[in-house]
Amino acid sequence: MDNQHRKIAGYRELTQDDIDLMNRVKAVGAELLALQAALAGRLSTDLEVKQAAAKASKLAPEHESSPECVELRRFLAAEPLRWAAIAKTDIQTGVMALVRAIAQPEGC
């Protein structure tokens, strides 16, 4: 693109190597975000399966200690969906930080 090397206020002029590196960072970031989304989807499915199994195992209130209920409590205590969401934010932050390291804006 012709406008790739135009000066943006507050930023230095980027070389083609800078632009190529920035594009690599963005591509790897997109790949990581796709992996995170796949994991979050799998975890959501796991939660639904574990909830259904726990519900099916409780024929009476005293069955709260069934292996399925114990597994659901373990899963919920580990907070995997929360950690997957944190990972998404951290990936986005990391990509932004790498791009900023390449662009080297003035000020701020």
UniProtKB/Swiss-Prot annotation:
Q: Which residues bind 3',3'-cGAMP?
A: Q4, Y11, K26
Q: Does the keyword Nucleotide-binding apply?
A: yes
What Pfam families does the database record attribute to this sequence?
Acb2_Tad1_hairpin
Keyword flag Nucleotide-binding: yes
Q: Could you say what a knockout of this gene produces?
A: Phage becomes sensitive to CBASS type II-2 system; phage titer decreases over 10(5)-fold.
Alphabetic keyword roster: Nucleotide-binding
- According to the lineage, what is the superkingdom? Viruses
Q: What role is this protein assigned?
A: Antagonizes CBASS (cyclic oligonucleotide-based antiphage signaling system). Binds and sequesters host-produced 3',3'-cyclic GMP-AMP (cGAMP) (thus preventing host CapV activation) without degrading the cyclic nucleotide. Probably binds some other cyclic dinucleotides as well.
Q: How does it assemble?
A: Homohexamer in apo and 3',3'-cGAMP-bound form.
* Annotated protein name in UniProt: Anti-CBASS protein 2
